[in-house]
A protein has these predicted regions:
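Domain-length cofactor-binding catalytic modules of enzymes
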Residues: 1-171
Length: 171
């Protein structure tokens, strides 16, 4: 992540923590479209994150599904890389066409998830099953899950638009 993006994320996190009266005990930056110099060569990870021995990373799920903090195992067969997320099951255009709005609303309500700025192509229906994605990487010796995060608030870039039918804002 570039310095500008990193600083911006830190500001967002600092403001959020202040508003909810909490403090951070650790910060994890997770690059997923970046080139690293390693052993005299460059490794470009597009949609993948470093997963060296003990390297801490985040593998996000989607709106309504778990995300994971993981530790890498340095698997050379995966070029010491793990997935950055569940991965899409379809293109953004197709995801918008296939979205079952009723099912999405039922999911966020049943799990008491507050959403703002939801994009139709970013719902859980657009992604693979995160539990299976994590398990496959565990089975292949790529990573070890440290803990899972269960979504309660999802805020996306369109959060300031009014009237988004997919938003579930609780006042």
């Amino acid at each position: 992540m570039g310095l500008y993006a990193s600083a911006n994320h830190n500001l967002i996190h600092d403001h959020f923590l202040k508003e909810i009266g909490c403090r951070s005990t650790v910060r994890i930056e997770n690059h997923h479209n970046f080139a690293w110099e390693q052993d005299g060569a460059y490794i470009h990870r597009k949609g993948a994150t470093p997963s060296g021995v003990g390297e801490i990373g985040i593998i996000p799920g989607s709106m309504g599904t778990n995300s994971y903090v993981v530790a890498g195992k340095g698997n050379i067969h995966s070029i010491q890389s793990s997935s950055h997320g569940a991965g899409r099951v379809s293109s953004r255009t197709q995801a918008k066409k296939n979205l079952d709005r009723t099912a999405f609303k039922q999911l966020v309500e049943a799990n008491d998830i507050v959403t703002a700025g939801v994009a139709a192509d970013e719902t859980n229906q657009a992604y693979k099953d995160i539990e299976r994605v994590i398990q496959l990487q565990v089975d292949d010796g790529v990573l070890t899950p440290i803990f899972k995060m269960i979504p309660k608030i999802v805020i996306m870039g369109n959060a300031n638009k009014r009237g988004n039918e997919l938003d579930r804002v609780v006042s």
